[in-house]
């Protein structure tokens, strides 16, 4: 399968962040969390923009199906990659966090998306965005659109009504991502003192890192008994591309344009620890597999070992942030709501 270039979606977001760090400094009251907030706000804005483009791509495809699905598929990938910046968050504006399941239903342990989408397109209904909002979350988000574009059971290419269903789902998704962007228009952390912010910051990183780790550990399951259908984007075969984007975003959040945890540690004369964290990010990304499909990798022992190796690297990263960095900052990380589910 053609390699998905992460920089397409993530590069735009990080460029936007770099611009904001200088242009917004005179507009926003200075707070130790500002650099991280700018990243989050830019990521949310990028997600909303990419899903706006997804609506346009879907509408164009439905009008000219003979042009093929390539454009809408590429735009779906861009939208998915932009979502990786916010995926797994448990810190931030409540109005943004409450949209998570609407944007993406995962894990899907029982192929609920497949069953619900099959039932949806079989109904003799011209769906609108408002109608989709009243349906199960499994047919509302990125996974539902992936099913339409990639699943063998989808009749998208030969059924105009199914195509309009795709437009409706895309529009509803765009509305929800715009709500996320709106929620990130102001900094939710401005009232936190230094210790509270450090706790929130480390929790933000830990939550997203742990979510990314689950995207490997669930499909890996028990040694010798993988569950490839538990992979995040198994239909489009882009699970590993998504995960690389997760790690890239976590590194950007950790560094926060020179104003993040890395700078904090160095200011405390903990450069050795800071170097180890950065090195772990760098090694993880530099050795990330070219293969984009976790589903395909789990079909043989070599691929399983490769995926397990990536998980071990993320576990080391978690140890460094969750234990060593947190201890140096005097932060105690509490129970994570995603643990044990």
Annotated model-derived regions:
Residues 1-8:
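Bacterial N-terminal signal peptides that target proteins for export
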Residues 15-18:
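C-terminal motif of bacterial Sec signal peptides marking the signal peptidase cleavage site
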Residues 21:
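Short, conserved catalytic or interaction motifs in soluble domains
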Residues 24-341:
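Mature extracytoplasmic or organellar-lumen-exposed domains after removal of signal/transit peptides
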């Amino acid at each position: 399968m053609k390699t998905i270039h992460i920089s397409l979606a993530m590069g735009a977001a990080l460029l936007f962040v770099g611009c904001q760090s200088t242009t917004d400094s005179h507009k926003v009251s200075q707070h130790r969390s500002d650099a991280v907030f700018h990243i989050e706000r830019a990521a949310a804005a990028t997600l909303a923009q990419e899903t706006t483009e997804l609506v346009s791509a879907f509408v164009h495809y439905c009008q000219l199906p003979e042009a093929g699905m390539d454009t809408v598929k590429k735009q779906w990938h861009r939208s998915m990659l932009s979502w990786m910046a916010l995926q797994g968050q448990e810190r931030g504006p409540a109005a943004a966090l409450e949209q998570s399941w609407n944007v993406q239903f995962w894990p899907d342990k029982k192929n609920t998306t497949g069953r619900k989408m099959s039932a949806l397109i079989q109904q003799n209904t011209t769906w609108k965005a408002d109608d989709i909002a009243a349906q199960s979350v499994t047919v509302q988000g990125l996974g539902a659109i992936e099913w339409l574009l990639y699943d063998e059971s989808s009749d998208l290419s030969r059924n105009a009504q199914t195509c309009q269903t795709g437009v409706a789902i895309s529009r509803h998704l765009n509305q929800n991502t715009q709500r996320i962007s709106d929620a990130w228009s102001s900094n939710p952390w401005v009232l936190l003192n230094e210790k509270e912010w450090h706790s929130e910051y480390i929790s933000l990183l830990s939550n997203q890192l742990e979510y990314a780790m689950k995207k490997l550990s669930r499909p890996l399951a028990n040694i010798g008994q993988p569950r490839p259908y538990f992979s995040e984007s198994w239909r489009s075969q882009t699970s590993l591309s998504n995960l690389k984007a997760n790690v890239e975003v976590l590194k950007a959040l950790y560094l926060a344009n020179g104003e993040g945890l890395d700078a904090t540690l160095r200011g405390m004369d903990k450069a050795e620890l800071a170097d180890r964290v950065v090195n772990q990010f760098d090694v993880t990304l530099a050795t990330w597999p070219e293969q984009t499909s976790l589903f395909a990798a789990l079909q043989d022992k070599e691929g399983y070992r490769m995926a397990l190796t990536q998980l071990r690297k993320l576990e080391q990263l978690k140890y460094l942030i969750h234990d060593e960095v947190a201890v140096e900052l005097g932060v105690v990380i509490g129970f994570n709501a995603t643990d044990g589910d």
